[in-house]
Amino acid sequence: MSNETLSFNTVAVTGALGGIGKEVIRTLHQLGAHVIAIDLLDSQEGNRIFKEFVPNNGEYICSDLTQESSEASLQAILAKSNYPDAVVSLAGIVVSGNLVDQSNSDIDRVLSTNLNSQMKLTREVIKHWIANKTKGQMIYVSSWVDHVPWPGISPYAASKAGLHAFARGVARENARYGIRANVISPGIVDVGMAAKQWREEPDYRARASRAIPLGRLQTPQEVADGIAFLLSKNAEYMTGSNLLIDGGASLYPMDPEEVL
């Protein structure tokens, strides 16, 4: 676990109950933050899981940010969370398949979840921070595929590249208020489908191993530690930056054997 000293008292995390999110909220709780977890699970189930990782000094909010399109509804969510002074934007989805096989709905869902909803949430958070002179920080979770394309996830890669560009714009526009925005770009993390394929599909494991110079999947804790660093006093001079922690996966393009 990270031993950073955090610069923020209250941190909201979207996508908080996913494989990476659970390690993030646990780590931030252990570092003394009041943690606000936002996710899709209903309140009863979400609270049960949340308490396993944050037994006290935190709260769970059930919300689908892709459906909270109005300014009023987003402000209501933020009011429930007592307006955090830092937000970790972890919510995201991937739809796998070549672009020609993806429907309009697939593409729209990826862009809505990974990019559009993050923009709208950021807008409402920053309005509050400016009005209350809060020197907050937005942290966006992008991906190494922002830098090196991975076959079969073009809309996902575009959404993550867009999130990176958006973060830089937010950083530039709001630095005068003491508001910062940074990005963390993990590699192939040992959760979800990647973890399943790594363990069960020899071809995928061989292909992924060739793509990762360090030769292993990234642990969720390694992502959480990177986020803790960005929230720490050691990173207070960083804004508009991208913390790329990918085991070297972005160092070189794929060879032909790595194409699906």
Where are these regions (language model features)?
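Conserved glycine-rich cofactor-binding loop
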Residues: L17-G18
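Substrate-binding pocket helix/loop in short-chain dehydrogenase/reductase
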Residues: N98-L99, D106-L111, A208
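Active-site loop-to-helix junction immediately N-terminal to the catalytic Tyr of the SDR YXXXK motif
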Residues: Q102, P149-A157, G169, Q197, ...
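Active-site helix of classical SDR
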Residues: T122, S159, A167
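Alpha-helical segment proximal to the catalytic Tyr-Lys
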Residues: K127, R172-R176, E236
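Residue(s) in the substrate-gating loop at a strand-loop-helix junction
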Residues: S143
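Short C-terminal tail/terminal secondary-structure segment
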Residues: A228, T239-L260
